[in-house]
A protein has these predicted regions:
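Rossmann-fold NAD(P)-binding glycine/threonine-rich loop
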Residues: 43-64, 182-224
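Glycine/serine-rich phosphate-binding loop and adjoining beta1-alpha1 elements at the start
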Residues: 14-94, 204, 223
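NAD(P)-binding Rossmann-fold cofactor-contacting core
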Residues: 1-2, 116-136
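Glycine-rich adenosine-cofactor-binding loop
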Residues: 1, 93-114
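Conserved Rossmann-like nucleotide-cofactor binding loop
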Residues: 105, 128-129, 185
Length: 224
């Protein structure tokens, strides 16, 4: 309780990621802080911002910082590869893998899968992202062509926080496809349709803290 008792004197308060894991209700925590204090938390909601304003506390979402996204991309990619190795009955070498999205996580994952010998195709919306993927020796398709391209892949990883793996796209995948969705809740996969079609669909969240907690902590420290 020592830390909580020191809240009224603190100029800066570091809260967890996600913010809801603070232990005590946020209103109680920030109500103990002095007006004008700076609170840093992860995945800050609108309701949390309302609570902070009422307490006179400035609340900053460090999870929204682009540098933290880049730092976390590597442990996320490595954690995803660990899941694929656990769940697949064959090597990633020679596997046809579809990666949806080419932001920091998609890029980090795609190049590492290719380094392991996987035949990686990136599906991205923007032409510049597809060009960057091809420049790295990867294949690339527009997101609008997902349903037409899906039959070639038995392993799919999504990094896009939007409904991209729809029932139509899932129906075009080979039965029993392994799908790992890395996007924030609710993800980009129609999980009910995936189960109905006989696929294995996993929503893998917070991989840096699960697979590389020390690295995740260092990344957070560098950000805040």
């Amino acid at each position: 309780m020592g830390g909580v008792q020191q809240l009224p004197q603190a100029d800066c308060i570091l809260l967890p990621l996600p913010l809801e894991q603070s232990g005590l209700p946020l209103a109680q925590l920030l109500g103990m802080a002095k007006p004008g204090a700076l609170a840093l938390g992860g995945k800050v909601t609108d309701s949390a911002r309302t609570i902070a304003r009422a307490a006179g506390v400035e609340l900053v979402d460090y999870f929204a910082r682009p540098e933290l996204t880049v730092y976390n991309a590597i442990p996320t990619a490595e954690g995803c590869i660990g899941i694929l190795l656990e769940r697949r009955s064959r090597t990633l070498w020679g596997a046809a893998v579809l990666v949806l999205g080419f932001g920091p996580v998609g890029r980090a994952l795609a190049v590492r899968l290719a380094a392991l010998g996987a035949r990686v195709t990136v599906a991205a919306r923007r032409p510049v992202q597809r060009a960057m993927a091809e420049e790295l020796g990867l294949l690339a398709v527009p997101l609008t062509d997902l349903a037409a391209a899906a039959a070639a892949f038995d392993t799919v990883v999504n990094t896009i926080p939007a409904p991209v793996l729809t029932a139509q796209v899932l129906a075009a995948l080979p039965k029993g496809c392994l799908i790992v969705d890395l996007a924030s809740k609710p993800g980009g996969t129609d999980f009910a349709a995936a189960r109905r079609l006989g696929h294995t669909a996993l929503h893998a969240l917070s991989l840096p803290t699960v697979w590389a907690p020390e690295t995740a902590g260092e990344a957070l420290a560098r950000t805040v």
